Structure formats: structure tokens, C-alpha cells
């Protein structure tokens, strides 16, 4: 084995020279230079500074403007809540531990940080699944003129939380475990060891199949069908021009969210899968730290995409920030938006 395993940690560094110490008790500067830990702290600070205001503003603007409280927006707000979980439960902790060079909060703190980070990521993934299914049902109409209403949105929200908890909670109760990863300043699910005492191998397989592969298959199936249907409808002119434009724009926004999610999380998932399937292989702490950087950036891209691609939300946000006046001259009360005939979504 090219790493060092302890009772509740795995350090990707051989202890042949006797320098490895518990990441809960001692600085890990033998893994990387102190300035690299400082860079990690600076990155976490940037994510907090950007992630908290933009996600909080997304929630606040929606509360302030009744016109934004549409069923589809409930799912998008769920993404903002998930991102705030990551900001408060993950980024603030990693910022503090990076400044100290090790995970100062101990195994209990590691469990909490790993739980909130995993919960936030899974809520985001399953929210994208619900959005994909909504787009598929509304645009492709496999169930005739189905209308995505408030009850369906609430059921979708419940699904995201149930599935996220089904992934994040088991390591807290003995099925797998959370351990420090990368530079040992943040925690995640143990991909590094088989750990038969906590049936780690079965959990990792379960997580990759149920909480990563299946959601991606659903998403790609829905959008594959959706792209085909939109092209076919455009060719046959089955819908009005306004409806077609609205459906296309909402669909484009959600697809961009999915692509951004893959950019953020696919490197992390791929590296984690490689580590798990190559037990004991030689890899350094940076090997897992860099993909984690991409994953953590997920907290800021969803609201940015939504604000940039949704004119109605953008106008409402500017009105809120500018004390009731839109500097672009678009009167909130007279803002014209394109609503789809089936889903009542107002995209850009």
C-alpha cells in the first residue's frame, strides 16, 4: 500500500519514513507546501464570497416577487438551498481547516462536513433529474397535455431530499464512513479503502450506481428525447412560434445547467472511481484535491446561469437591488415574458 491507513483516516502518503501523522491532530505539511494550503483557503474564501450572496439573493428575490413563484422555479430554488448547504456546511469548514493545515474539528466535525457537502451535491444532482423529467413530460408530451403544477413540484422536491439523504446519511450510521481527503482539510466518502468493518465496498458501488449513473442515464435519455421532439415540432410547425421559443429557451437553460454540473462533478467522480478500483495505487494528495476544486465551484454556477438566461428573474433582481427601480428601464409591472402553454415558465 502506498498510503497510510489509520482508524478513521487514509493519508495518500507512505509512512516508511515515519512522517505521517493523524490529519485530525497534526498539520499535514509533508503532503504539500504551506502556501498550497493557503491557496486552498483563498479558494474557499472566494467561493464563500461569491456563493453566499448570489444564492441568498436568489431566494430573497423569489420571496419578494410573487410572479417568480412558479412550479419550475421551486426546483431551481431547491438548487439554491443545496448550494447554501455546501457554503455553510463545507466551504466555511474547509477555509478554517486549510488555514491550520489539518482537519482541526476531529472525526465528528469530519462527519458533519462530509455529510453537508454530499447532501448539497446530491440535492443538486437530483434536482437536475427532476428538471429533466419535467422538460421531457412537458415538451415531449408522453402523457398527452400534462401540466406541471405545484403538487408535482412539491413531489419533485421531496424526491430530491429523500434521494440525497439516502446517499449522505448511511456513512453516519455505519455503512461506509467520511474521512479527510486530498490535502486532508475537507472530508468526503471513503473511496480509498475497502474497510470491510463498515461494508465500504458495497456502499461505494451503491452510490456510483444509484446516485450517479442512474441519474445521468435519466438526464441524457430525457434530453435526447427532448432535442428530437423540439426539432420535429419546429419542422412540422405543431406549436405556435411563441410557445416554441419559450420551450426552447427554458430547455436550453436547463441543458446548460446539466453541462455545467458535469464539468464540475465528472472529474471528481472519475478520480474517485479510479482510486476505488485501484486500491493501493500510487497517487498524491493533489490528485484528489484539484477535482474537488471543480466540484465545489458548483455552488455558484446554477444561480449565475439562471440569472443570465431568465429575463424576468433578472429584472426582478435588479428591481430589488435598486430599491424598486430597474436601471435598465424595464418596468417590472409591464415586463412581457413568454410563457409556455403547458408549464407556465417565463424564460429569457
Curated annotation (Swiss-Prot):
For the site labelled Plays an important role in the conformation switch to the active conformation, the residues are 113
Listed binding positions for Zn(2+) are 201, 279
Modification(s) after translation: Phosphorylated on some or all of the serine and threonine residues present in the C-terminal region. Contains one covalently linked retinal chromophore. Upon light absorption, the covalently bound 11-cis-retinal is converted to all-trans-retinal. After hydrolysis of the Schiff base and release of the covalently bound all-trans-retinal, active rhodopsin is regenerated by binding of a fresh molecule of 11-cis-retinal.
Ranges of the Extracellular topological domain: 1-36, 97-110, 174-202, 275-286
> Which Gene Ontology BP terms does the record give?
absorption of visible light; cellular response to light stimulus; detection of temperature stimulus involved in thermoception; G protein-coupled opsin signaling pathway; G protein-coupled receptor signaling pathway; gene expression; microtubule cytoskeleton organization; photoreceptor cell maintenance
- Cellular component terms, GO, for this chain's entry? cell-cell junction; Golgi apparatus; membrane; photoreceptor disc membrane; photoreceptor inner segment membrane; photoreceptor outer segment; photoreceptor outer segment membrane; plasma membrane
In this UniProt entry, which residues carry a covalently attached lipid of the kind S-palmitoyl cysteine? 322-323
Subcellular location(s) per record: Membrane; Cell projection, Cilium, Photoreceptor outer segment
Q: How does it sit in the membrane?
A: Multi-pass membrane protein
Which region ranges are annotated with the description Interaction with SAG? 330-348
- Which segments cross the bilayer? 37-61, 74-96, 111-133, 153-173, 203-224, 253-274, 287-308
The UniProt entry, under InterPro entries, shows: GPCR_opsins, GPCR_Rhodpsn, GPCR_Rhodpsn_7TM, Opsin, Retinal_BS, Rhodopsin, Rhodopsin_N
**Which loops or segments lie on the Cytoplasmic side of the membrane, by the record?**
62-73, 134-152, 225-252, 309-348
Q: Name one GO molecular function term.
A: G protein-coupled photoreceptor activity
Primary location: membrane
Q: A Pfam family in this protein?
A: Rhodopsin_N
Q: In this chain, where does the modification N6-(retinylidene)lysine occur?
A: 296
User: Which parts of the sequence carry Phosphoserine?
Assistant: 334, 338, 343
| Residues carrying covalently attached carbohydrate according to the record | 2, 15
Disulphide bond pairs: 110-187
Self-association or partners: how does it assemble? Homodimer. May form a complex composed of RHO, GRK1 and RCVRN in a Ca(2+)-dependent manner; RCVRN prevents the interaction between GRK1 and RHO. Interacts with GRK1. Interacts (phosphorylated form) with SAG. Interacts with GNAT1. Interacts with GNAT3. SAG and G-proteins compete for a common binding site. Interacts with PRCD; the interaction promotes PRCD stability. Forms a complex with ASAP1 and ARF4. Forms a complex with ASAP1, RAB11A, Rabin8/RAB3IP, ARF4 and RAB11FIP3; the complex regulates Golgi-to-cilia rhodopsin/RHO transport in photoreceptors.
Q: Which family does it belong to?
A: Belongs to the G-protein coupled receptor 1 family. Opsin subfamily.
Q: What is this protein called?
A: Rhodopsin
Organism of origin is Sus scrofa
Amino acid at each position: 500500500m502506498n498510503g497510510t491507513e489509520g482508524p478513521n483516516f487514509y493519508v495518500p502518503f507512505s509512512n516508511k519514513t515515519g512522517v505521517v501523522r493523524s490529519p485530525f491532530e497534526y498539520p499535514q505539511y509533508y503532503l504539500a507546501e504551506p502556501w498550497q494550503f493557503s491557496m486552498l483557503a483563498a479558494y474557499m474564501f472566494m467561493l464563500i464570497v461569491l456563493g453566499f450572496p448570489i444564492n441568498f439573493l436568489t431566494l430573497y428575490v423569489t420571496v419578494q416577487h410573487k410572479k417568480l413563484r412558479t412550479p419550475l422555479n421551486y426546483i431551481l430554488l431547491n438548487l439554491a438551498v443545496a448550494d447554501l448547504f455546501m457554503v455553510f456546511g463545507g466551504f466555511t469548514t474547509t477555509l478554517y481547516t486549510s488555514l491550520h493545515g489539518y482537519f482541526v474539528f476531529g472525526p465528528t466535525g469530519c462527519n458533519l462536513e462530509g455529510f453537508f457537502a454530499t447532501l448539497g451535491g446530491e440535492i443538486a444532482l437530483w434536482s437536475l433529474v427532476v428538471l429533466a423529467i419535467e422538460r421531457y413530460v412537458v415538451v415531449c408530451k408522453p402523457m398527452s397535455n400534462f401540466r406541471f403544477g405545484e403538487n408535482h413540484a412539491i413531489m419533485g422536491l421531496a424526491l430530491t431530499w429523500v434521494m440525497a439523504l439516502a446517499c449522505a446519511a448511511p456513512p453516519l450510521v455505519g455503512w461506509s464512513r467520511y474521512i479527510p481527503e486530498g490535502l486532508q482539510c475537507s472530508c468526503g466518502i471513503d473511496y480509498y479503502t475497502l474497510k470491510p468493518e463498515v461494508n465500504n465496498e458495497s456502499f461505494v458501488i451503491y452510490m456510483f450506481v444509484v446516485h450517479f449513473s442512474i441519474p445521468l442515464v435519466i438526464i441524457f435519455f430525457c434530453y435526447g428525447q427532448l432535442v428530437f421532439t423540439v426539432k420535429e415540432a419546429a419542422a412540422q410547425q405543431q406549436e405556435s412560434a411563441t410557445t416554441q421559443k419559450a420551450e426552447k429557451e427554458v430547455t436550453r437553460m436547463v441543458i446548460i445547467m446539466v453541462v455545467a454540473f458535469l464539468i464540475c462533478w465528472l472529474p471528481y467522480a472519475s478520480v474517485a472511481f479510479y482510486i476505488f478500483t485501484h486500491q493501493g495505487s500510487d497517487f498524491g494528495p493533489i490528485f484528489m484535491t484539484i477535482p474537488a476544486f471543480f466540484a465545489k465551484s458548483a455552488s455558484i454556477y446554477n444561480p449565475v446561469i439562471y440569472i443570465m438566461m431568465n429575463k424576468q428573474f433578472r429584472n426582478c433582481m435588479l428591481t430589488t437591488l435598486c430599491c424598486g427601480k430597474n436601471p435598465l428601464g424595464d418596468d417590472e409591472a409591464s415586463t412581457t415574458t413568454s410563457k409556455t402553454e403547458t408549464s407556465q415558465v417565463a424564460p429569457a
